[in-house]
Amino acid sequence: MSQQPGSDRRVNFAQEEPMTLGEKISHRMDQFKEMVSSGCCSCASRCPSVAIVLILALVILGILAAIPLTLMLTSSAQRMSTDSTDLSPYSIRHPKFWPKTDKIHFNDLDGIPMSSLFPPNVSTCSGFGFACTGAVHMIIPSSKRCDGIKDCQDGSDEENCKECQSVFSCRSHVEEDSKTKRKTKVLPTLICLTAEKLCNDVQDCPDGSDESVCKSTCSKDQFKCTGNNACLPTSAKCDGVNDCTDGSDEKNCNECQKGAHKCGKQCIKASHVCDGVAQCADRSDEKECDCKSCSGSDKALCEDGTCIKRTQVCDGKKDCTDGMDEENCPGSCSIEAFSTKTKQLTCSDEKRYTESEACSGVVEACEQSCPKCHPKLTFTCPAVGGSQKRCIRRSKVCDGINDCDDGADEKNCTPIKECGIENASQFTCDRKCLDASRRCDGVWDCEDKSDEQNCQQCSSGSIRCAADKKCLPAYTRCNGVAECSDGSDEQKCSCEECLGAHSNTYMCNESNRCLKRDEVCSPYSMCPNATYTDKAYCAALVLKNSGRFPY
């Protein structure tokens, strides 16, 4: 039988052996390799098929692993956001009337108990007021929220307002209805405006309503300002805010409105009541306050309801009843340690000093506050005309400068040329001629203090530095300044020697050392063997300098 032409080119599939599983996998990998090399990367043709497949598998596994990790991070961020409401750097409360003291949570200062930095009867009313969006550590009182005045640097206190405390408000924007194409007033928030923004030829409201309140005739529930013809609601009268340019809306007020406080016939606006600054002569606008009214990062509330500035806490001046704002402050010691007989004076700087310090001539603010000048340390300038007598330090006598109004401190002075002629024991210093009795008496008559050096002994009531052979005035003992080279005048100080005799001093917690309060931190505590409280006080000053803390 003869073959048909072309029959030799037919393939007999029945005779072909099937591929194994491994051959199929290898075949698929070769196909994938060919696709990659021809589609995106020609260099893949030189790589083994197995390597390419393994790389692809690792990429897929990485993507799958990233999905649960992303979900975990998102959940953690939400949880942290919820917990962040506890960021309260000023949570100082009286242990009897407020919750337990919280801790601050700022940077490496975490864990410092604020109770060690504030008196126990003074609160900062944590949780009250409005936290500025751009600076959460800056808190403003609720009375300044949505009042038409930007108190936060970012103006966030005037954003998203649902209700205004200002005299005028308008809708924040006007949206168009997409179906009717008509403008409909959609009011998610309000714009709060003070009276000075009305009728000033500047459109602040989207609908221009702030420029349309000036009318010839006002409605029954309005009154007209004579200065700019603005029609304002009657509730704007006697609210402590001059809404009319001539102030006529705040004259002859028998009663005050909108939370304003009455002083005589004057109304103090609500935002100035319980703000730590007395507007009334009797300070009644700062009494009977609570945390809602006395809130803010610069305020402090005394247990008796007095609102004070936070800078007034532990400043050496009693602002709360019975001086509770000065009790148990860092660097203080027990009040029982002071002698009840120690007299104190309030000088022209409104700070209190012991009479011995105030009348020794070293505090200029007290020169006219003393009933009697120290007979040894000072010179008494007589009262002349309407002036009061003054106590000046003795080194100012015969220095060529008239410190007394009548020049009494420069009278009866021996000229330098005649010094030692009639009295051989006289000596000179700083263009002065002094008697020998003025040497080594524990009083600095010379500005360079040379009259108290090279002393074998000192007068009674003074201090002798054995290492330096010099005499010091008694008031220099434990004043925070080491006059002796060995520091012996500042060692083993008692509470009364430190705080009982000096102002503006800091008593180290356990080392019986006194330091000047403005020098105790540099920036860390300079106290020997500084305690937790000493360190916390200096940490507080770090926060203060960054605008984030109490004092």
From Swiss-Prot:
It comes from the Eukaryota. Signal peptide: none annotated. The chain crosses the membrane at residues 50-70. Residues 124-162, 163-215, 217-254, 255-290, 293-330, 372-414, 418-456, 457-494 form the LDL-receptor class A domain. It holds the Pfam family Ldl_recept_a. Disulfide bonds join 132-152, 146-161, 164-192, 170-205, 199-214, 218-231, 225-244, 238-253, 256-267, 263-280, 274-289, 294-307, 302-320, 314-329, 373-391, 381-404, 398-413, 419-433, 429-446, 440-455, 458-471, 465-484, 478-493. Keywords: Cell membrane, Developmental protein, Disulfide bond, Fertilization, Glycoprotein, Membrane, Receptor, Repeat, Signal-anchor, Transmembrane, Transmembrane helix. It is a single-pass type II membrane protein. Disruption phenotype: RNAi-mediated knockdown results in sterility due to the loss of oocyte fertilization. It is found in: Cell membrane. Glycans are attached at residues 121, 423, 509, 529. Residues 1-49 are cytoplasmic. GO terms for biological process: receptor-mediated endocytosis; single fertilization. GO terms for molecular function: hormone binding. Residues 71-551 are extracellular. InterPro entries: LDL_receptor-like_sf (IPR036055), LDLR-related (IPR051221), LDLR_class-A_CS (IPR023415), LDrepeatLR_classA_rpt (IPR002172). GO terms for cellular component: apical plasma membrane; receptor complex. Probable receptor which is required for the oocyte-to-zygote transition although its exact function is controversial. Seems to be required for fertilization probably by promoting the interaction or fusion between sperm and oocyte. Conversely, shown to be dispensable for fertilization but required for the formation of a continuous and cohesive eggshell chitin layer by maintaining a homogenous distribution of chitin synthase chs-1 at the unfertilized oocyte cell membrane. This is LDL receptor repeat-containing protein egg-1. The lineage of its organism: Eukaryota, Metazoa, Ecdysozoa, Nematoda, Chromadorea.
